[in-house]
UniProtKB/Swiss-Prot annotation:
Family from the record: Belongs to the PsbT family.
Protein name, UniProt field: Photosystem II reaction center protein T
Organism in which the protein naturally occurs: Synechococcus sp. (strain JA-2-3B'a(2-13))
Alphabetical keyword list: Membrane, Photosynthesis, Photosystem II, Thylakoid, Transmembrane, Transmembrane helix
Keyword rRNA processing: no
Amino acid sequence: MEAITYTFILFLTLGLLFFAVAFRETPRITKK
């Protein structure tokens, strides 16, 4: 059952990276 753990970590990392990039690269949407 290691696949679930690996998938969870992968999704968590991807989500964090996506959020960081979205918040840093798109300030116009946040300001709107």
